[in-house]
């Protein structure tokens, strides 16, 4: 064990306040200290240049002073018996923490819920000196009659139980309001806003009308005698898409504008093209469609630009459309069941999507952050529509307060100097490091050392390792948009290394008859071009020239869909749940069911299909089992969709730039959900691991041991012949192999063949992985408490004989030689 290794990475019980934490200070060895870790975040200027050796992206640690102040006061308030709360609140708090509760709540859940209750009901002397910053509105919005509303953000790591916190606070608010209708601190109408249909469907259990099937009974959040009172409240689940005002015109683009509702005018530049579309943030119209929309009164041409040949190239237009009024929009969102009720409690799930864009112009680093320009534009459109929709609710009905829940409540861009910083209204923090120390999530293992001897190993940040090795033509100019084949030329090596480990893990998992699920491998790419080439290489065995075949059998689509490709466009189109493309809908069902072997069932054992699945399966003539059941590898652009709750991810590779620790946490977070929550004899959760290459996460304090759950014994059956049936015996020859006579001989003049030098200092064949490392130079880099594991090509090579490799090389050489113009020898002779 070296200076950074410890016998037990998980320090705390998930059900109790952390008693210890790893104290990390620049220039010092990490030490185990008593008490809870102070709340802080790591900030790096997104415009800062990466450091040498492929760059550090950790940034500077900055204390969250408001969170630490609130945390201290909540602890005192809790110790003194929650002074100031109502009788209903006190009953719920005691119910959640009672002795003998079978489904104990995680401390992370209790801490977040109690913090919000404290800020609402805490006695004034405890709240003294605590001021939560309000969100700033622009002067234009104020002149339009909008006003801000209180926001409280709880930072909770992926897998720490945000949905349960929403259920706890929904019950608290509704029951208090029902018991005292005049108390404006509480609301009996709760609007839950989420980013996509996946989360919306999963949050259906927050509806009190579900009764015994609701989260309140499944997780034992509300005593049975209070359920009738809880059912008097309303929990509304909506996608952010509903906040976009509906147009009142009908009949398509050729129809006349219906002048009903509110007129909205916008200016934009349109490029005249061969088809009507939107690409890379630009709008294209055919000449025919432009003329049609002008005739319909939808567009007014303000200016024109012609090309050298005199043809119309671009037009600046003013578009005019009529949309529903704010009153109609709010009534549509809240529905008739709510009536005219006011003082709405808002809950934003994945709240980093909901903030005010300060400027319209994009940031220089935007494409590196989101992967593709379209994805960035979609994100900022979502943020704008989401927050402006809440503004309308506040203006017409009033918002009690807004609860923001996210693992990463940060500004992602277009907010000036606030980019990469947390929301100023963050009041509670139980982040990834805390979740790791409490065992709530898997422990990521990252590259810490390889054969190159460099301070930062290449596979720690694969993108920055590859780019300097590319030629200017391969790199793709100043925008660094490399050719996919050039990326794969170097990336195939780390993929083979982790792929070999994945295959071994799949074999180990298959020995457990109680859980037939396979481990899942994820590759996150910069753009759709790289994702396409990778997918064809992995799933279809189509290797680009000069790239060896992948030879990972579990990734090939031979009759089953073992590997899928998920583009950001597919995710965005299906987020609203209203896509008209059947294949896009099917891909959404596939992605949502990765790691699930069967549908949940009702009390009589009938499968509970998600809305629309059964009809789509029948229409496409496909089986009705979960379509993601057999998926073992996902090639994606971006970080996959929020709410993706697959718990069987074991390996992740990033093939894209990472400009912030925020983005690293979002990508790695997709693989951190635990497969099991069994508590060990010491009251702590057992370790689970996810191996990660290419995602430069520098704020993880440690890694886990490789020892997982002991393999289950396989039940064996002895097969033998029955003597009385010997006359039915059938014999077969034992064939050990086949030999084919080769009459043609090919000789090679080795003297004229250039030498191939294998350089382990350039492409590392061995990599060591573990957690965070503080080196003697006093800067954050990879290491920390925990043992080191080796990642090599041993597992990848283990199942391949030398003779097989020789024939593979001969086949590749033959294919390349035959493709050359000067080759005159028929392929069959070679």
Whereabouts are the PLM-identified features?
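RecA-like P-loop NTPase motor core of helicase/translocase proteins
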Residues: 1-830
């Amino acid at each position: 064990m070296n200076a950074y290794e410890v016998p037990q990475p998980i320090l705390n019980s998930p059900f109790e306040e952390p008693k210890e934490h790893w104290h990390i200070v620049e220039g010092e060895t990490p030490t185990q200290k008593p008490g809870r870790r102070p709340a802080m975040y790591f900030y790096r200027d997104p415009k800062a240049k990466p450091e040498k050796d492929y760059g550090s992206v950790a940034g500077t640690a900055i204390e969250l002073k408001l969170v630490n102040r609130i945390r201290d006061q909540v602890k005192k308030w809790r110790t003194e018996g929650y002074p100031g709360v109502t009788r209903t609140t006190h009953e719920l708090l005691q119910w959640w923490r009672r002795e003998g509760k079978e489904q104990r709540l995680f401390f992370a859940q209790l801490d977040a819920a109690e913090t919000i209750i404290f800020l609402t009901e805490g006695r004034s002397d405890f709240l003294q000196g605590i001021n939560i910053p309000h969100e700033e509105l622009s002067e234009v919005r104020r002149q339009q009659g909008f006003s801000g509303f209180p926001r409280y953000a709880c930072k909770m790591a992926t897998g720490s139980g945000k949905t349960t916190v929403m259920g706890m606070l929904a019950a608290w608010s509704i029951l208090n309001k029902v018991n005292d209708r005049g108390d404006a601190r509480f609301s009996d109408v709760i609007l839950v806003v989420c980013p996509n249909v996946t989360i919306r469907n999963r949050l259906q259990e927050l509806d009190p009308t579900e009764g015994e099937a609701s989260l309140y009974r499944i997780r034992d959040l509300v005593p049975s005698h209070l359920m009738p009172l809880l059912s008097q409240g309303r929990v509304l689940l909506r996608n952010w898409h509903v906040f976009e005002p509906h147009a009142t015109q009908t009949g398509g683009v050729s129809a006349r504008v219906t002048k009903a509702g509110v007129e909205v005018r916008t200016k934009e530049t349109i490029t005249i093209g061969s088809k009507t579309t939107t690409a890379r943030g630009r709008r294209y119209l055919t000449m025919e469609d432009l003329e049609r929309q002008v005739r319909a009164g939808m567009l007014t041409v303000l200016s024109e630009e012609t090309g050298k040949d005199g043809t119309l190239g671009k037009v600046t237009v003013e578009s005019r459309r009529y949309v529903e009024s704010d009153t109609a929009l709010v009534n549509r969102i809240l529905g008739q069941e709510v009536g005219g009720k006011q003082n709405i409690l808002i809950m934003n799930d994945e709240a980093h999507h909901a903030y005010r864009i300060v400027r319209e112009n994009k940031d220089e680093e935007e494409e590196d952050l989101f992967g593709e320009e379209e994805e960035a534009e979609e994100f900022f459109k979502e943020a704008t529509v989401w927050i402006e929709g809440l503004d309308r609710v506040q203006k017409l009905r009033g918002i009690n307060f807004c609860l923001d829940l996210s693992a990463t409540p940060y500004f992602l861009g277009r907010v000036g100097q606030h980019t990469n910083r947390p929301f100023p209204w963050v009041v509670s923090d139980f982040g990834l490091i805390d979740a790791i120390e409490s065992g709530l999530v898997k422990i990521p293992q990252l590259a810490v050392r390889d054969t190159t001897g460099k301070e930062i190993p290449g596979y720690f940040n694969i993108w920055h390792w590859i780019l300097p090795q590319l030629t200017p033509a391969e790199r793709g100019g100043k925008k660094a948009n490399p050719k996919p084949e050039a990326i794969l030329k170097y990336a195939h090596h780390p993929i083979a290394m982790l792929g070999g480990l994945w295959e071994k893990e799949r074999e180990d998992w298959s020995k457990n008859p109680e859980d037939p699920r396979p481990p899942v491998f994820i590759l996150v790419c910069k753009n759709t071009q790289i994702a396409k080439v990778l997918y064809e290489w992995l799933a279809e065995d189509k290797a680009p020239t000069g790239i060896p075949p992948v030879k990972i059998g579990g990734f090939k689509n031979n009759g089953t869909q073992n590997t899928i490709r998920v583009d950001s466009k597919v995710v965005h189109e299906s987020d609203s749940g209203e896509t008209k493309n059947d294949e896009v809908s099917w891909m959404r069902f596939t992605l949502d069911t990765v790691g699930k072997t069967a549908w949940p069932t009702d009390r009589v054992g009938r499968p509970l299909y998600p809305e629309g699945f059964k009809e789509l399966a029948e229409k496409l003539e496909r089986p009705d089992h979960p379509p993601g059941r057999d998926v073992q590898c996902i090639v994606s652009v971006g970080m996959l969709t929020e709410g993706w709750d697959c718990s069987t991810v074991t390996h992740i590779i990033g093939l894209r730039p990472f400009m912030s620790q925020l983005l690293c946490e979002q990508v790695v977070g997709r693989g951190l959900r635990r497969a099991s929550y069994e508590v060990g004899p010491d009251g702590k959760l057992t370790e689970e691991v996810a191996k990660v290459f290419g995602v430069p996460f520098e704020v993880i304090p440690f890694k886990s041991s490789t020892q997982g759950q002991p393999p289950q014994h396989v039940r064996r059956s002895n097969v033998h012949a029955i003597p009385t049936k010997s006359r039915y015996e059938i014999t077969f020859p034992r064939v050990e192999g086949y030999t084919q006579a080769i009459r043609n001989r090919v000789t090679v003049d080795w003297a004229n063949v250039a030498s191939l030098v294998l350089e382990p200092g350039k492409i590392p064949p061995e990599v060591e992985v573990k957690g965070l490392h503080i080196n003697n130079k006093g800067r954050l880099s990879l290491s920390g408490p925990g043992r080191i594991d080796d990642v090599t090509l041993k597992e990848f090579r283990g199942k391949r004989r030398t003779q097989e490799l020789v024939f593979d090389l001969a086949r590749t050489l033959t294919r390349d030689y035959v493709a050359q113009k000067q080759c005159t020898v028929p392929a069959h002779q070679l």
